[in-house]
C-alpha cells in the first residue's frame, strides 16, 4: 500500500439536478450538500489527507440566476458558521478562502472570514474556492513572484493536488486548479453528492493507495 493523497480536490456537483429529480427545495438541496461535504472532509482527514480544496463557486458561476446563487450562499454560510465549528478542532484545522472576495456578498464573506479567523491550526487545511478563476490565480501568482523574487511555481497559494473527486459523471474540471491538477488522479462519480456515503470515499482513497503516483516520472 502506498500513502494516502496529501491533497484532495473536491468538486461538489449535481445539487440542482438532485433537487429537480427529488422535487425538493433548491436551498434545502444545497444545505444537504454542505452536510455531505463536511462528512467527506471529516472522512478524508481521518484517512490521513492533510489538505482538501473545495470548489464552491467559479467566477463564471456568478452569472447564474439569483435564486440559485442565493441557495449556494445560504448553504455556504451554514457550512462556515455551523458545520465546520461542529466537526473540526480550530487548534488543528485551518480554513482559507480563495477567489475574488469583492464579488461575494457581505453575508458570505463575513461567514468565511469568521471561519478563517477562528481556524488557524496546522494539521488539516480546508481551502474553499469561491468566485475563483484560474486566470486570476496565475496573474496573482505572477505578481507575488515578482514581489517575493521567487519562481512563479512557488508563488501559488495552493499546492499540488493528488486526487480530484467530482460528484457527477461529466468528465470536466470546470477550471478547477488547472496548474495544481496536472498529475492528479481524476474521479468522476455517478453518485450525486447528496447520496454519497463515507464508505464510498474510503474506497476511493483505498484504491488510490494501491498504485504508485509517478507524476510523469
Regions found by a protein language model. Give the residues of each.
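Flexible, compositionally biased loop and terminal segments
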Residues: 1-217
